[in-house]
C-alpha cells in the first residue's frame, strides 16, 4: 500500500471539476481510500498594459489569468488503482502532478 498525492491545475474550474470527478470515480471503483478533492487558493496573475502605443500613460487596461487547483490524496493505493489512473483520459487543459508520499 502506498500513498499518492495528485495535484491538478487548470484555468477553467468546470473542466477541472469534471476531471476530478472522473479521477475520484475511478479510484473508488478500485476500492482505495481517498481524501479530497481539496480546493487550493486560486492564483490570480494580473497584467497591466498601456492602451496606446506611445502616449497617454493614464489610459491602461488590465487582464488577469486565474489558475484553479485541487489536491487529491489516495491513502491506500494498490497496483490496480495506479493502473486505472494510467488508463484515465483527462482533458488536455488539465495539468496533473503525481507524487508518491511514502517515507
UniProtKB/Swiss-Prot annotation:
Q: Which UniProt keywords apply?
A: Ribonucleoprotein, Ribosomal protein
Q: Which InterPro entries match?
A: Ribosomal_uS10, Ribosomal_uS10_CS, Ribosomal_uS10_dom, Ribosomal_uS10_dom_sf
Q: Name one Pfam family in it.
A: Ribosomal_S10
Question: GO terms for biological process?
Answer: translation
What superkingdom does the record give? Bacteria
Q: Which GO terms describe its molecular function?
A: structural constituent of ribosome; tRNA binding
Q: Cite a GO CC annotation.
A: ribonucleoprotein complex
Q: Cite the record's note on assembly.
A: Part of the 30S ribosomal subunit.
Purpose of the protein? Involved in the binding of tRNA to the ribosomes.
Q: Which family does it belong to?
A: Belongs to the universal ribosomal protein uS10 family.
Under what name is this protein listed?
A: Small ribosomal subunit protein uS10
Amino acid at each position: 500500500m502506498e500513498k499518492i498525492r495528485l495535484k491538478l491545475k487548470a484555468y477553467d474550474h468546470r473542466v477541472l471539476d469534471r476531471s476530478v470527478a472522473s479521477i475520484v470515480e475511478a479510484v473508488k471503483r478500485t476500492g482505495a481510500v481517498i481524501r479530497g478533492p481539496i480546493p487550493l487558493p486560486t492564483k490570480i496573475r494580473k497584467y497591466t498594459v498601456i492602451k496606446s502605443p506611445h502616449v497617454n500613460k493614464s489610459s491602461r487596461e488590465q487582464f488577469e489569468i486565474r489558475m484553479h487547483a485541487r489536491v487529491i490524496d489516495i491513502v491506500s493505493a494498490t497496483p490496480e488503482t495506479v493502473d486505472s489512473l494510467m488508463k484515465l483520459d483527462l482533458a488536455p487543459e488539465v495539468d496533473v502532478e503525481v507524487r508518491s508520499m511514502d517515507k
